[in-house]
């Protein structure tokens, strides 16, 4: 068989290249040493001793530069670099000069590792590592190896820091859950039993859930728990306590567990209330709104951000400062309790607690724009949480946009690792709030023609006031910044044991939150009356429904809320051991009025003609007039407990105020 000579030569050549490539890595170190010895032999042939010394020095330098230092670099654990380097020097470098040079380089690696470990911040570690590479390495190949080692260490430290941050977050969440469980355990055991029963019902099929929940409610009623509106601690089958069972399935009531933590650090937290429309379709009027609560420690700084939603801020406690960026203009305002200010969507803003002792409390009412009931924050600065939005862009884009180098980007972006709310020194706080004194505060003026600054509710006369309470409100017609959102802001201070109402809003639906104290709330609701009302003759026409109002009850503590829909009569009672402080945000606020159903003044029922009242109530005119004219106060009244005490001391018999509700068939 004939063999093509050229093909055979090609095959032999390729085979020789393959054998050479497989042996070169094994013989690399030996080849380097032979080359080094050959270099020195050639030096010995030179004529003068000076030339010989310079030649040998060049051989030494050439050999040192050819050492592959990547084999002494541990990619996974920098802590072992030092130990492995020394061990490999002893094993792989045979010549005394090479041993000496190798050991010297290992010593540098060890010192580098000690200095690296002393510095806790990964970014500073990285920068110092890069400086050492530039200081000690002159050969490009060695410089690249050193820089790659810096990169690997930096990435590993970032992963470790992120892991520590996530562990801290989990620990904080676990503590929060434990606290909520402790609060649950403090409640009445029978109430917990009822809630457990309802949770078991939720696991059943939909058609079985209703009957199951009815059994839970019936079982709860049969326990016959004590207490009533006048004295919740009293035994017996009082009216008020039996209403607590309704609180758990009350679509208008939001307890503290309805607040989810958006951000939490050692310096404060930001919580957002459950989506209104997600809770119940009865709250569809609020589907574009969210409520956010912020608490910040003294001398705390809240990172700059902007929202994809319009926001109204109400300061409910403490003293702060607000910075807003409108295009290329910065506005600065000192904030005090009672201040109201609007932040338009897309406006970058940041907050400072300028008080040394008191926490800053702010409520934010958001009107969403992009997705109904959903909003997002956008932070230009941050680290792991929040992540800065600038870090989303590619390195090339940022270098071009900011006209800078990658090293400077790395030194700035992503370095804030303490979270959204961080601590600032008093000197930093003074510097941040220095120009706030130059910003004029809101001057109360009808229509708000002159300023975008804050409006303070307490700088105007109370809307309603007597010895039982005070109420303050700012409406869109008072403050121009509220007109676009058509939102009002309301604050009421009800003295201990007193009450406000009953009353209803003519146009506005309000979200009412307890800032301090405790509140007992009763509200008449026609939408939950299906369990009691019915359709006559089985007819399905809406106009033939029986009219019935469900009595909605709730007991509110601090940070808990209730929604009062438009037209729903409602009463707030200060039931705790201190005054009750409420604040509220109302939508559809323009031309809204509170219509009161009791009291000497502003009582709409008193304006009805006596003959009409007699016909409507089917009772003698005198009895009707005495009933609705017996209250000497207006808006705020003595509460049920105070009224009972006054009645027991008085020789004149008075009809209890709560009987008004019974009188109208509540």
UniProtKB/Swiss-Prot annotation:
Coiled coil (UniProt feature): none
Chain ranges of the Cupin type-1 domain: 271-410, 455-625
One of the record's GO molecular function terms: nutrient reservoir activity
Signal peptide annotation: 1-27
Main location class: secreted
Subcellular localization: Secreted
Segments of skewed composition (Basic and acidic residues): 239-251
Gene Ontology, cellular component aspect: extracellular region
Keyword Ion transport assigned: no
Pfam family, any one: Vicilin_N
Disordered, as annotated region: 161-191, 221-251
Keywords tagged on the record: Allergen, Antibiotic, Antimicrobial, Fungicide, IgE-binding protein, Plant defense, Secreted, Seed storage protein, Signal, Storage protein
GO BP: any one term: defense response to bacterium
PANTHER family from the UniProt entry: CUPINCIN, OS03G0336100 PROTEIN-RELATED
Function: Antimicrobial peptides 2b, 2c and 2d have antibacterial and antifungal activity against a range of species.
Family: Belongs to the 7S seed storage protein family.
Listed name of the protein: Vicilin-like antimicrobial peptides 2-2
Originating species: Macadamia integrifolia (Macadamia nut)
Source lineage: Eukaryota, Viridiplantae, Streptophyta, Embryophyta, Tracheophyta
């Amino acid at each position: 068989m004939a063999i093509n000579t050229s093909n055979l030569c090609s095959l032999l050549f390729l085979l020789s290249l393959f054998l050479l490539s497989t042996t070169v890595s094994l013989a690399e170190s030996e080849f380097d040493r032979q080359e080094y010895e050959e270099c020195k032999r050639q030096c010995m042939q030179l004529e003068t001793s000076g030339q010989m010394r310079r030649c040998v020095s060049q051989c030494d330098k050439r050999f040192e530069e050819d050492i592959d230092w990547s084999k002494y670099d541990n990619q996974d654990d920098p802590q072992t670099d030092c130990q492995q380097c020394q061990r490999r020097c002893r094993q792989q470098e045979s010549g005394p000069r090479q041993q000496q040079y190798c050991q010297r380089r290992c010593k540098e690696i060890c010192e580098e590792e000690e200095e690296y470990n002393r510095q806790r911040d990964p970014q500073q570690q990285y920068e110092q590592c890069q400086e050492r590479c530039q200081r000690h390495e002159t050969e490009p190949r060695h410089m690249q190896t050193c820089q790659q080692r810096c990169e690997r260490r930096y990435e590993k430290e970032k992963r470790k820091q992120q892991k520590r941050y996530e562990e801290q977050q989990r620990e904080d969440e676990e503590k929060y859950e434990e606290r909520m469980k402790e609060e649950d355990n403090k409640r009445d055991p029978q109430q917990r039993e009822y809630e457990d029963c309802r949770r078991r019902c939720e696991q059943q099929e939909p058609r079985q859930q209703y009957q199951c929940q009815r059994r839970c409610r019936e079982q709860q009623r049969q326990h016959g728990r004590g207490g009533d509106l006048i004295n919740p601690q009293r035994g017996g089958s009082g009216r008020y306590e039996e209403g607590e069972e309704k609180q758990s399935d009350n679509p208008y009531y939001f307890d503290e567990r309805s607040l989810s933590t958006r951000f939490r650090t050692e310096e404060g937290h930001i919580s957002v209330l459950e989506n209104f429309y997600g809770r119940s379709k009865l709250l569809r009027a609020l589907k574009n709104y969210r409520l956010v609560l912020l608490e910040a420690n003294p001398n705390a700084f809240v990172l700059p951000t902007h929202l994809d939603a319009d926001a109204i801020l109400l300061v409910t406690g403490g003293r702060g400062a607000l910075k807003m960026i409108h295009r290329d203009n910065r506005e600065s305002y000192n904030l005090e309790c009672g201040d109201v200010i609007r932040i338009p969507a897309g406006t970058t803003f940041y907050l400072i607690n300028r008080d040394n002792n008191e926490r800053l409390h702010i409520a934010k009412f958001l009107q969403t724009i992009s997705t109904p009931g959903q909003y997002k924050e956008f932070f230009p600065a941050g680290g792991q949480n929040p992540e800065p939005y600038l870090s989303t862009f590619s390195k090339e884009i940022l270098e071009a946009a900011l006209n800078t180098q990658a090293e400077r980007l790395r030194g700035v972006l992503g370095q804030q690792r303490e979270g959204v709310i961080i601590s600032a020194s008093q000197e930093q706080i003074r510097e941040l709030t220095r120009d706030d004194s130059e910003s004029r505060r809101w001057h109360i003026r009808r229509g708000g023609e002159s300023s975008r600054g804050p409006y303070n509710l307490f700088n105007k006369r109370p809307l309603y006031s007597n010895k039982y309470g005070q109420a303050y409100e700012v409406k869109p017609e008072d403050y121009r910044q509220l007109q676009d959102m058509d939102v009002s802001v309301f604050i009421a201070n009800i003295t201990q044991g007193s009450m406000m109402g009953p009353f209803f809003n003519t146009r506005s639906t309000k979200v009412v939150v307890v800032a301090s104290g405790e509140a007992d709330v009763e509200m008449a609701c026609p939408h939950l009356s299906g369990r009691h009302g019915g359709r006559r003759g089985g007819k399905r026409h809406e106009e033939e429904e029986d009219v019935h109002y469900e009595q909605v009850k709730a007991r509110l503590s601090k940070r808990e809320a209730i929604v009062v829909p438009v037209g729903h009569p409602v009463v707030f009672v200060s039931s705790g051991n201190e005054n009750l402080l409420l604040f509220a945000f109302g939508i559809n606020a323009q031309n809204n009025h509170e219509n009161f159903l009791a009291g000497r003044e502003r009582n709409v029922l008193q304006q009805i003609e006596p003959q009409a009242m007699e016909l409507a109530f089917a009772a003698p005119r005198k009895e009707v007039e005495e009933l609705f004219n017996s209250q000497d106060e207006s808006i705020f009244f003595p509460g049920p407990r105070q009224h009972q005490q006054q009645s027991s001391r008085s020789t004149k018999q008075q009809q209890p105020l709560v009987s008004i509700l019974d009188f109208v068939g509540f």
